[in-house]
Structure formats: C-alpha cells, structure tokens
C-alpha cells in the first residue's frame, strides 16, 4: 500500500513539474497597446482576420491570434508597421513568415525607389519567427519593440 501511495505522490509531482513547462500565454492585443504607449505609436489597427488576408495574404485558418497596426500617414508614426501573429501550428507559422516577408520586401522596394532615409530604417527591421509566433516590426524603434515582444513570449 505504501508503494502505491509513494508512486501516486511521485506521479503528481512529475505532472506538476511538467505543467509549468508549457509555452507562456501572451495576449498580443495587450502587448500591442503596451508598445503603442511605450513608443508613442499613432497607428490604425487592423481588426479582423479578413484584414490580415486583405493586407498580408494571411489565411484566417493560420491565425490563433494577432495584432497589427500601420502608422497614420499624417503622424510621426507614418513609417511604422507592426504585425504580431500567433499561428495555429508550425506549418502555419512558415506560411505567415512567407507572407510577411513578401510584405517586408514590398516595403523595402518602395523605399528603395523613393526614400533613401526611410530605406536605411527599413534595412534595420526584419521578419522573425519563434515557434508559432511570427512578427514584422518596421519603425524607428523596431529593435526595442522586438525586444519587448521577445521578452513577452519567453
């Protein structure tokens, strides 16, 4: 009987330990609000998964949650574009990474044609993938925003 109780206690302890090993839950909309506040971003939010398809060619079925904003054209944030996506699985993450890379390349080409100053800023930005999270952060404070994002998902 003591062996059974000892085994049961050991099993419960193991399950408790492994329960803490899961991925950290993060609300991307709340994180975006924090970024906006911290870095004074004045942007237009994309609200629906249909917007994500319309602007980035990302299928709704690939998205678990997202937050996406584009700086308003008449503000200091006009060249800011922030897209944070948690995908449904690793295959979806690869598809979203491809879609955001295509958008990044389009922004790069546009700035290469019109604005050398903005092109330098875009060159310092990137698309990232970490597990099921994919980001495209373009803006003056992109590096700081990416650090905030990475700290939030770890």
Spans of features found by a protein language model:
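Positively charged n-region of N-terminal signal peptides that target proteins for export
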Residues: 1-11
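Mature, Sec-exported extracytoplasmic domains of Gram-positive
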Residues: 22-154
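Hydrophobic alpha-helical membrane-insertion segments
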Residues: 11-12, 141
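C-terminal motif of bacterial Sec signal peptides marking the signal peptidase cleavage site
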Residues: 16-20
